[in-house]
């Protein structure tokens, strides 16, 4: 029997690993049937589908030429998964703190976020239908982002 909570946590962790590895196509692939909602003071911004998510991350994320990564480490935790009674849908809440270090920029936390996720189950397994990103804490993002958010 599959552990739904385990499979969902794996997706949450994959997002962080792909992003830290600079694999923006893999990040986008997680949302081939889903959307990302960025919560903001001026209202929410929704990006739907792998192609749009790939373009979004490419427009914001600074990848360094030495290794093709953003030189970040996402620490994701406090994951709470709730599977619906029918076993075909689920939700999860989690938090992440992102650390970064580059030349001239010592290791430091640069942002803290809260994720509110929705998932569906298909014959191939679980997938994201929605990720809501709520930025809670902001540090120096100048070495991480290509433009301000």
Give the label of every model feature segment.
Residues 2, 44-47, 106:
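Charge-dense, low-complexity intrinsically disordered segments
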Residues 1-21, 25-30:
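Short, low-complexity N-terminal intrinsically disordered segments enriched in polar/charged residues
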Residues 24-96:
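A solvent-exposed, acidic/Ser-Thr-rich amphipathic alpha-helical stretch
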Residues 66-149:
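A beta-strand edge to alpha-helix "cap/lid" segment located at domain peripheries
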Residues 20, 47, 110:
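Short glycine/serine/threonine-biased micro-segments
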């Amino acid at each position: 029997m599959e552990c739904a909570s385990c499979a969902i946590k794996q997706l949450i962790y994959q997002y962080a690993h792909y992003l830290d590895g600079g694999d923006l196509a893999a990040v986008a692939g997680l949302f081939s049937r889903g959307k990302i909602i960025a919560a903001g003071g001026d209202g929410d911004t929704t990006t739907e589908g792998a192609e749009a998510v790939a373009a979004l991350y490419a427009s914001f994320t600074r990848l360094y030429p030495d290794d093709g990564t953003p030189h970040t480490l996402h620490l994701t935790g406090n994951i709470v998964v709730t599977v619906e009674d029918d076993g075909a849908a689920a939700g999860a809440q989690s938090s992440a703190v992102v650390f970064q270090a580059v030349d001239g920029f010592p290791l430091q936390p640069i942002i803290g976020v809260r994720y509110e996720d929705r998932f569906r189950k298909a014959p191939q397994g679980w997938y994201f239908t929605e990720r809501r990103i709520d930025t809670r804490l902001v540090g120096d993002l100048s070495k991480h982002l290509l433009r301000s958010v």
